[in-house]
Structure formats: structure tokens, C-alpha cells
Curated annotation (Swiss-Prot):
HAMAP family: NDH1_NuoI. GO terms for biological process: aerobic respiration. This is NADH-quinone oxidoreductase subunit I. PANTHER family: NADH DEHYDROGENASE [UBIQUINONE] IRON-SULFUR PROTEIN 8, MITOCHONDRIAL, NADH DEHYDROGENASE UBIQUINONE IRON-SULFUR PROTEIN 8, MITOCHONDRIAL. [4Fe-4S] cluster 1 binds at C54, C57, C60, C109. The gene is nuoI. GO terms for molecular function: 4 iron, 4 sulfur cluster binding; iron ion binding; NADH:ubiquinone reductase (non-electrogenic) activity; quinone binding.
Length: 179
């Protein structure tokens, strides 16, 4: 009985040896993403006017089960509007470490301003860089966040480190950390 089971196992191994490998040599090769893939959040603009679609209603923040979104609304100036309507998102922040990419914010948005895109490379060196602000997410800003940062830091040495205290955020002190 033991010899038969060993022969079956060896046969299975030999059969798998000649099959095409499933792995992808990332980053040289890119895997094709599924149409329903949920990646980095994007805030969109109206195509004709260029105004932001976000009206600062905070429905995305209310729908977020991970409490990753913070929205602070501001009154729109009628002479220089930021978005159509009376209000706009003065502050829009999303903590990508808390986000679970469920898409509830996208579904809750009444104007279609929040869209989960296809970008999935969001690693960074510092905690504060993982909290995306409105300027990091608006479509129409040249290049991605990482490309703009790399262009600004071209030729500068990069210092990589870690926090000894674990990097826990203190609610009373806010999100600013010493470098």
C-alpha cells in the first residue's frame, strides 16, 4: 500500500513539472487586473468644468466600516467655486492603513466623486505618507503620488528607518510624528 501512494505522489509531481508556472515575475511582468479590482482611491472632477465632484457630504465617511475617511466640509465661494453646489470638501483624508478596500465609500457617494482605481503600489517609508489628502487623490494632478515624490526627491539620499515605540497614534496629539 505504501509503494502505490509514493508512486501516485511522484506521478503527480512529475505531471506538475511540465505545466506552465502560475507565478508572475513582479515587477518586470504585471498581472492583468480583474475588472472589479479595487485599488487606490481617486477623487474625480467634472469633465467639462474641472470642478471637484466631491460636495463634502461625508456619506463616504459614514459608510466606511473601518473609519478610514475623514471629511471636513467648507462653504463654497460663489465667485470662485471649488465644486458645484453650496459646499465642498475642505479637508478629505483617507488612512490607507485602515482601509479594507470594500468599496462602500464608492457606493455611498451621491455624486460619483469617490472611485477605487487600479493602482495598488501604495507602500511608503513613513506613516504620515500613507494618509492621503485631497491633493494626493484628485484626478488631474500630474502623475501619481509616488511619481511626484520621486521627481521631487531625485538625487537626494533616502533614509529608511523604523519607530521603536511601534508607531501607535496618540488621539490627543494628532497625527504629526517627529522625523
Amino acid at each position: 500500500m505504501g509503494v502505490l501512494e509514493i508512486a501516485k505522489g511522484m506521478g503527480l509531481t512529475l505531471g506538475k513539472l511540465f505545466q506552465k508556472p502560475v507565478t508572475v515575475s513582479y515587477p518586470e511582468e504585471r498581472a492583468t487586473l480583474k475588472p472589479r479590482f479595487r485599488g487606490r482611491h481617486v477623487l474625480t472632477r467634472h469633465p467639462g468644468t474641472g470642478l471637484e465632484k466631491c460636495i463634502g457630504c461625508s456619506l463616504c465617511a459614514a459608510a466606511c466600516p473601518a473609519y478610514a475617511i475623514y471629511v471636513e466640509a467648507g462653504e463654497n465661494d460663489p465667485h470662485d467655486p471649488v465644486s458645484p453646489g453650496e459646499r465642498y470638501a475642505k479637508v478629505y483624508e483617507i488612512n490607507m492603513l485602515r482601509c479594507i478596500f470594500c468599496g462602500m465609500c464608492e457606493e455611498a457617494c451621491p455624486t460619483g466623486a469617490v472611485v477605487l482605481g487600479n493602482e495598488f503600489e501604495m507602500a511608503d517609508y513613513r506613516y504620515n505618507d500613507i494618509i492621503y489628502g485631497k491633493e494626493d487623490m484628485l484626478v488631474g494632478v500630474e502623475g501619481s503620488r509616488a511619481q511626484r515624490r520621486d521627481a521631487a526627491n531625485a538625487g537626494k539620499p533616502v533614509r529608511v528607518g523604523f519607530r521603536v515605540d511601534g508607531g501607535a497614534r496618540d488621539e490627543l496629539e494628532g497625527v504629526t510624528y517627529p522625523q
